[in-house]
């Protein structure tokens, strides 16, 4: 058995198992695991091409055709940007809320000290009078 045949068998088994898990319900968006699986099988099936691609990427040539961004559905890219934006906005809002609570606690304790000193001054003035 040639090594390529073994890789083909393994990729076919994994593909059949992923199809059986999904059933006949195929959505427009592919999961990240499916994309990683496709990339790994592509690398395993073409050893020479993969090693050449790695060599060109390491040597620093700007060959972006290896990443296949033109085949990526636009919905997936937009979904990633939208989710990232939502995470950033929620994080900033939470940090702002925590900051406001911290500032209000600090100012509240300093206001109590000011009120207490004002009361003591009033009592001292009242006792003198």
From Swiss-Prot:
Gene Ontology cellular-component terms listed: cytoplasm; fungal-type vacuole; fungal-type vacuole membrane; nucleus
Domain of life of the source: Eukaryota
Residue stretches spanning the membrane: 77-97
Start and end residues of each stretch annotated as Disordered: 109-129
Major location category of this protein: membrane
Keyword ATP-binding tagged: no
Keywords: Membrane, Transmembrane, Transmembrane helix, Vacuole
Subcellular location: Vacuole membrane
Membrane topology summary: Single-pass membrane protein
Induction field: By the genotoxic agents methyl methanesulfonate (MMS), bleomycin and cisplatin.
Composition-biased stretches (Basic and acidic residues): 111-129
Miscellaneous remark of the record: Present with 922 molecules/cell in log phase SD medium.
Name of the featured protein: Uncharacterized vacuolar protein YLR297W
Gene source species: Saccharomyces cerevisiae (strain ATCC 204508 / S288c) (Baker's yeast)
Lineage: Eukaryota, Fungi, Dikarya, Ascomycota, Saccharomycotina
